[in-house]
Amino acid sequence: MEKNQFDQPVNVLPTPPFKGDHVGSLLRPERLKQARLQRQNGEITAEQLRNVEDEEIIRAVEKQKQAGLQAVTDGEFRRSWWHFDFLEQLDGVEAYVPESGIQFHGTKTKARGIKITGKVNFSEHPMVEDYKFLHNIAGDHTAKMTIPSPNMLYFRGKLEYSPYEDQEVFFADLTTAYKKAIQTFYDAGCRYLQLDDTSWSLFFSEDGRARIRENGQDPDELSRFFARCINESIADKPDDLIITMHICRGNYQSTWAASGGYDAVSEVIFGGLDVDGLFLEYDDDRSGGFEPLRFVNRSDLQIVLGLVTSKHGNLEDKQLIKKRIEQAAEYVDKNQLCLSPQCGFASTEEGNLLTEEEQWAKLKHIINIADEVWHS
């Protein structure tokens, strides 16, 4: 197999997702954390902070290439949260400080929220320039952009705009905004876009489904609405743009927010979404088994198995990972399967509880396993 200059396997497929891939976010280097704190305290300018971000992103991209990854991201180094930073910059959306943070297993995040105060739209968005920077340094690798799913605005946004009490009015504006976003990133050169989505975790447990009912909604109807929102948002995407979705149960400082398998919404997720690939959590028992994959009904849908955890630094047993891939292949053609971490390494700027060295070792481990499974 072809090797790159760092003597790592070059993991090449015609289009992403790649056989060895990753979700996107990376641990923030200490220098970057310090610079963000200095900016917050007024000790450096926005331009000085951006210069630090640029330098650390360049370094992170090179490290991704060294690990053998074909897709590279900016590590979400310019964000403090994986979703709020993007959603706040949509027209009609504002940041606010709620009474408390988001509840995770044994802990809470810092308090931060978003509210919908006007007509939602996508116009001038700073992350377009962020993508252009990544695109320009990606070289012969694929620059991957990650943004929150449109469902996340519905899921996390506090509604303060009365016309959106009509769900269909909200749906029309939200999907139109995302169509504009997708086209704008495409025009900037993006050919690999990932929608990150934790809203699906509501359906994975009876507790979550009960919460939906308590809110006066029917879980089955809501899941179909979420699917329709995704499908309408990406309906006009260019043919050569790959759009994947990462489905997450929460990832904050190595903790989680939800549990349960994909069973209750497996037909909707695996048989009803028009995305090109699905990044799925499968790193522990909270994610259930592979049986729901039997509802995959398209030969062109790539299933990226998140069998390697980003929550701790211990490397998984290679043979066990290979065995689990074979188990998943009982339900989906092995050529439709890929391998990745179950989530990013830093969904918020605090990051998970492992070192940068352990993070890079995890990514190299994924590439090595993928190379042996699909290319040996």
Question: Predicted regions: what is each one?
Answer:
Residues 1-376:
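Domain-level signal for soluble alpha/beta catalytic cores
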